[in-house]
Amino acid sequence: MSKSLKKKSHWTSKVHESVIGRNPEGQLGFELKGGAENGQFPYLGEVKPGKVAYESGSKLVSEELLLEVNETPVAGLTIRDVLAVIKHCKDPLRLKCVKQGGIVDKDLRHYLNLRFQKGSVDHELQQIIRDNLYLRTVPCTTRPHKEGEVPGVDYIFITVEDFMELEKSGALLESGTYEDNYYGTPKPPAEPAPLLLNVTDQILPGATPSAEGKRKRNKSVSNMEKASIEPPEEEEEERPVVNGNGVVVTPESSEHEDKSAGASGEMPSQPYPAPVYSQPEELKEQMDDTKPTKPEDNEEPDPLPDNWEMAYTEKGEVYFIDHNTKTTSWLDPRLAKKAKPPEECKENELPYGWEKIDDPIYGTYYVDHINRRTQFENPVLEAKRKLQQHNMPHTELGTKPLQAPGFREKPLFTRDASQLKGTFLSTTLKKSNMGFGFTIIGGDEPDEFLQVKSVIPDGPAAQDGKMETGDVIVYINEVCVLGHTHADVVKLFQSVPIGQSVNLVLCRGYPLPFDPEDPANSMVPPLAIMERPPPVMVNGRHNYETYLEYISRTSQSVPDITDRPPHSLHSMPTDGQLDGTYPPPVHDDNVSMASSGATQAELMTLTIVKGAQGFGFTIADSPTGQRVKQILDIQGCPGLCEGDLIVEINQQNVQNLSHTEVVDILKDCPIGSETSLIIHRGGFFSPWKTPKPIMDRWENQGSPQTSLSAPAIPQNLPFPPALHRSSFPDSTEAFDPRKPDPYELYEKSRAIYESRQQVPPRTSFRMDSSGPDYKELDVHLRRMESGFGFRILGGDEPGQPILIGAVIAMGSADRDGRLHPGDELVYVDGIPVAGKTHRYVIDLMHHAARNGQVNLTVRRKVLCGGEPCPENGRSPGSVSTHHSSPRSDYATYTNSNHAAPSSNASPPEGFASHSLQTSDVVIHRKENEGFGFVIISSLNRPESGSTITVPHKIGRIIDGSPADRCAKLKVGDRILAVNGQSIINMPHADIVKLIKDAGLSVTLRIIPQEELNSPTSAPSSEKQSPMAQQSPLAQQSPLAQPSPATPNSPIAQPAPPQPLQLQGHENSYRSEVKARQDVKPDIRQPPFTDYRQPPLDYRQPPGGDYQQPPPLDYRQPPLLDYRQHSPDTRQYPLSDYRQPQDFDYFTVDMEKGAKGFGFSIRGGREYKMDLYVLRLAEDGPAIRNGRMRVGDQIIEINGESTRDMTHARAIELIKSGGRRVRLLLKRGTGQVPEYDEPAPWSSPAAAAPGLPEVGVSLDDGLAPFSPSHPAPPSDPSHQISPGPTWDIKREHDVRKPKELSACGQKKQRLGEQRERSASPQRAARPRLEEAPGGQGRPEAGRPASEARAPGLAAADAADAARAGGKEAPRAAAGSELCRREGPGAAPAFAGPGGGGSGALEAEGRAGARAGPRPGPRPPGGAPARKAAVAPGPWKVPGSDKLPSVLKPGASAASR
């Protein structure tokens, strides 16, 4: 019989599941044999008749291999660990077993040495086996050890002779060579060595295996060449499915795994899902029919295109690196050639770039990797259905000018349901995993109906059969929604739990504002930004809903971008147009932001060098000539902007030439030569581009497919341009309006969504000034080694301006010369930042840093004569200015903030010294107490004449302290000198030392607060938070109270000669905390030059009701907020554009472990914030449960709502539940909000008077934790437990002195970890919460003063000295170095001799006695390797005696 007729099933078809329980004796009724220690799979020994308590499934058979226990893969584990997993699991046990035979017998060595195609079940199982082996064994190698490697932890380094002996003795499960060195995987010992006793419990049920904490397969071991055995031909009937997208990937044997593993040198751990051992019959048949039986029978794989590379994620998934464009992609570029349209695919196959996901919660959905979105409907069935419905041919490439979509006349709006014209109908829909099964449109304006846009096939609405497209939604559960915003209605639908029903009253008779059946409506300019776009046709299909629709569904109520009448743009004068053409018609409210104003036109001459791949930009036809469509190589096209009109090329006028002729001219330019371009920028904006794009420039900054330096490709190919870059030598690209680049839509519209959060309406897309007193300029900076060389201030409250802080000498901004301290930042790479949070802007800058450059737009106040204000005697240089229509009221507010200094402003230093009354305050303390005040330093400030020149002030005075008793010191007093020594220009750390060395008394020379402030702004309490006293936003938001008559209002004061007053920065406390974030790439992320990281994940279940595309980080839980806890529309500001938008409600049931539930909480009514999960203990029930994450909001505790709940009540509820707790959680962003962020039920400007104040070290260049990074290991001393060992009191009740640290604050906050003390004395202390933590280790390569990364906590010097009997680290001695991060902010310091904190409580308790604590450090300052924890809740005695370098959580500085 020929091979082609052989149809033997794969061994996975024989896998069966048995569900059993423990019998009355508590036994399972069978014995286990084998195990990795014997080089075998675990398999069933004797199955005792009548002793196995079967619940369902098949019977257990002796000698069968055991693959999984309750979905935990156990192949590769020792018998000890398998038994531990079984012991940990509750009844019933679900065992997956398979009969031995063929390629799977009990011999692990045999199976591991077989070759399988990547992506196959066997290949995945091999990787899982290796992962499990490395929990208990360490690979050995004959190569010399490298710097930073720990012998016995990373590798066992042996001689070649020893290696050969091991191999001969059969002690190695795998062996091979890599780069002429031998590598092997020894059998693990039956009983683990002391080194590996403490491995993580990631193998336990419910855990999520990840790279964190779990031993990884070393790259060298995975890549070693071995004498692999071919599997029997009848068994190998699978071909791999890379990423599960139904696309066949050409085989590559496992020994040729790519040598790139991102930035790390190790291959990652097992993929999240275990292998799927059973497959649908039709899939099996398809495999049988179409796939060869042996890998070598397949045709040779096509080579990857030039400069492409294959790599693997930490979960073992394949991705591809394009070194040409420095981007990564999930899609194999070789397969794009074989791609076919979805309508031509069979029903059981998927188009190129699609992946099918079977989710246990959300059911089956599909991932579109090309457009980075998800949907429930099968794309093939959808495409065929659309083809039948619309019978729409593919549109050929063309250069025709854009046509505007044919929007209909807007119907007369009414809020009175009785005045609606049409047929009323009511229906009841039950919410399913797909939501209600329809999408809505409208509600973007107050006078706009909300209408049904589409009914999703097979959804609840479609099954009900009553709802139709265009139906106006009138009532939702007796609530009239006429006049409600889109976001309001979305939240109403989201608030309905799955499984519950909603009553709808609809009115039929109103057409949609556009015709969804009209093919013309698919013609959306790729870069025109619509408020309500019609469906977009991509690759000839209508089935792609853009992110723009997602915006209209999920964002807050988005104001119209123009306050003009809908058609007013037609009558605008065309003075600014040099070519005499008119802008295209704009219909209704769908005004592109680019078309709502004009800039001053200008001609610019640029010189661009043509490279081997072309010029690095594409052009497209437009009514006025050839415009730059896309910048593919930003660095190669300096000064060029998308939308620029090309006037001349090498002195040849091309304005009247056709697209093809201009392309030919560009082609004829020799490679390597300079080409001179004259471009026209400004005037009326192009119909489809903007010279200063709002969102479009962003796609060049990070999207895998947009930052191409690629030549053009035909747009009708069903694959993204990035994949075939090398195939097309042309450097231009025809512009087809029917086929916008999906990544452009994705990136642009995401940026729109985020830019519209809490931004008031404006008429111009540029933040032009409302008068002649401000000038805008664009600044392009390239990142240097030290970053962009400037600091960012502001953004503490929504609406507060973002300002340029200090410009670092000799940095990029300083050398450029155009950026000045005090400039207001308006755009970052085309993204508007007005009204955004400080963190949002910092993240934009981090993103730009990874791309190596940034385009900034700033506003600067202009003095007489229209010249920009000189700063520091430096001319601003020649800049182009733009003028457009005045903005709305928000512009007035923003500008007025800068019209005059606020009443709280500090005067210049000279004025302070001559005009203000200074006084000396002497504070005496006792031996056992501190001075009782906190100093805040604000050195990094703009250097203009109106800024803070006395940078150190009193930030807090502790009740009952010497500072409080002397009654001469007040919060806000500026400190000029300490003990007669001027501290104005002194670093904070030196001030700390100065006060620490002062002994029992200190003399402070101060400028009293009364001298700095007008009486109207005097604090209501001397010890009140400066944020509450001083911030104008805290007193009265100008947005809420714009009256110029208010004494505090900057509007009421005359304009000073200073160029710009930094409103809100002298006054706003939080900006002082965050102002010292220098604009550098985030050191916790790969540097911008390392582009080989895996692509961003976006494969997320479609969001509930509306099939929303997923967030950038698409492997997070779902996007939609299914059960909004409260209709309250006030939300936290969007602080990070990269944060996963996965606001998903879910329930977690947990049983208490030996040390409690294993999590801690933050927040409560007293802090004006909701309750959040603060941290998870490594070995606690919460982390084993696998669902709870740091930053999740707690909505209910044991069925009781947490709204307005105090911290103490939450603890009480958790304790009252006994051994179990049930929590309703709302998926968070991975960050715990700070206490001064506006809570959903508190005013954004509300102050927290009783909360502690903190400053920051001047050297602190770190941004707060980003959700893209894992939270640090949790602090077990704060887990919830009733026992005395676990402090479950309110984490930050500053009203309870007994719970305060010496500086009046709790010790812990999110991201700060403390070493679990090995000292029995310290562990036994009841006040464990105040026990000292490990000193933060400096990160490798950073100076100690900058090394205070989030995640490291300070030690209480006095407690450390008393409790541990050892000397406390000197950096902590005598001072409490505090940082305000919210309730529970912990002191933090830099390292030995550091003092990198910005707040000081002058506590001198153990100061003179403390000295540095000696201890080993990892080589090179690298972080210590974190050992794993044994699977299960067991703990082996003596594990605490491990070397500190191996202890989890131990920091270098404390060792």
From Swiss-Prot:
Ranges of residues in domain Guanylate kinase-like: 109-283
Modified residues (Phosphoserine): 686, 884-885, 1014
SUPFAM superfamilies in the cross-refs: P-loop containing nucleoside triphosphate hydrolases, PDZ domain-like, WW domain
WW domain boundaries: 302-335, 348-381
Claim: Secreted is one of the keywords in the record: no
Summary of the tissues where the protein is detected: Specifically expressed in brain.
Function: Seems to act as a scaffold molecule at synaptic junctions by assembling neurotransmitter receptors and cell adhesion proteins. Plays a role in nerve growth factor (NGF)-induced recruitment of RAPGEF2 to late endosomes and neurite outgrowth. May play a role in regulating activin-mediated signaling in neuronal cells. Enhances the ability of PTEN to suppress AKT1 activation. Plays a role in receptor-mediated clathrin-dependent endocytosis which is required for ciliogenesis.
Protein name: Membrane-associated guanylate kinase, WW and PDZ domain-containing protein 2
Source species: Homo sapiens (Human)
Name of the encoding gene: MAGI2
